[in-house]
Amino acid sequence: MATCLRGITKRVNLLQRRVYPSCGHLIRDDRDETKSGSSDTMIREVLARNGTNKLSSMFADRHYQSFATGPLGLGLSSCRHMSSTPPEWSDKVDGIDFVATEVVPDEIIEAVTTTSQAVVPAINEVAIAAADSAFPVAALQHLIDAVHSFTGLNWWASIALTTVLIRGVTIPILLNQLKATYKLNVLRPQLEELRQEMSTKAQDPEAMAEGQRRMQLLFKEHGVTPFTPLKGLIIQGPIFISFFFAIRNMAEKVPSFKTGGTLWFTDLTTTDTTYILPLLTAVTFLIMVESNMQEGLEGNPVAGTMKKFSRIIAFLSIPVLIGIEKALFCYWLTSNLFTLVYGLTLRRPDVRKLLNLPDVVNSSTRQPSPSSPLPFSFAEPKDQSVVAQEKPPMSSESSSSVPDRRISRSSVLNQRIRTLERQLKDRKIKK
């Protein structure tokens, strides 16, 4: 009998070992720290925590513990492993921050933060400033920013360098304008003759049409138009306006302009309280007028008016320039200096020969030089060589002013007599 009981006990133990692992997940404990003890002790703790359940209380009794730890583990199937007591390590977890301090060092976090704060505004500030601008103004702002980023220069030097680049691109167009102006001045005597003939035949529509046709042929033959002197205004006008609005917009909306200057004009967003930049701009403009505009204007009927008007503008512009931001002077002053260098360079004979410009003729009083067209000149200056070609050489007997007037009057009378003779011949032929 004892042998049979012993065999049954072994079989029950084997069956319990086979079935019990399948129920092990019901009492899993994922904590890092596990308490040592047998499975019976763990089951008792579970049953004690769920003592409110009647069935659990039943299994908590000593008489039913053997049934709970039986081979099929029926006691475990009727209770839940739900504890209201928080784990021991829960008070150590306040958030996710403890992981970041271990994974990412503080030095890297500070470096990324400072880099994002310093680099991102520098990249986006010009784009934000140019967002609400017109296309030419926005394009010019991006060009200044590209020069600033590529060269690493301060804003004042970037504006000056961009001015030189833009003015350098317009040099071929200005040279073409200068050559066309010379050709137009050579045609001026012929055009004046045609105008006189047309004025005498103002009542004859056919004669007026013929005169206009001959003028068009002359313009086409020499490749010029009456609007040739306006090329400088058409080109330089939009450039000046675009620079003005672009730089002023950047001075208002780009924060780095506050430290983008040098010397006494470090802050480019404010006016110059020392009045040095406004005075320099006005003086360079006046020098530009005296050295470039006065040359070759002797034959132009509006030469005196233009020169006086430019002088007045040079003096009246000082109060206006005082209220302008310093950043604008980086363009304005550079543009004036560029025009001066451009005019002085064209005075050299070797440069004129290289550019295929007409030679300068020496005068009795001084040696004239080629005119340098200014950005906003409504009348293009004439070169003295063209004036010398227009006017025939005067003899020594006609050096005084009275013989000059007599010769001019006699030439006009002869011209009128010839036109009257032609009209009489035309009438006889028609009859």
UniProtKB/Swiss-Prot annotation:
Q: Which residues cross the membrane?
A: 119-139, 155-175, 227-247, 269-289, 312-332
Q: Does the keyword Zinc apply?
A: no
UniProt keyword Hydrolase, yes or no: no
Q: Which GO terms describe its cellular component?
A: mitochondrial inner membrane
A Gene Ontology molecular function term of the record: membrane insertase activity
Q: Where in the cell is it found?
A: Mitochondrion inner membrane
Output compositional bias ranges, type Low complexity.
Answer: 392-402
Segments for region (Disordered): 362-414
| Keywords, in A-Z order | Membrane, Mitochondrion, Mitochondrion inner membrane, Transit peptide, Transmembrane, Transmembrane helix
Q: Where is the transit peptide?
A: 1-22
Topological category with respect to the lipid bilayer: Multi-pass membrane protein
Q: Say where the protein is mainly found.
A: mitochondrion
Question: Which InterPro entries did the record assign?
Answer: YidC/ALB3/OXA1/COX18, YidC/Oxa/ALB_C
Q: Which family does it belong to?
A: Belongs to the OXA1/ALB3/YidC (TC 2.A.9.2) family.
Purpose: Probably required for the insertion of integral membrane proteins into the mitochondrial inner membrane. May participate in the activity and assembly of cytochrome oxidase.
This chain belongs to the protein called Mitochondrial inner membrane protein OXA1-like
Origin organism is Arabidopsis thaliana (Mouse-ear cress)
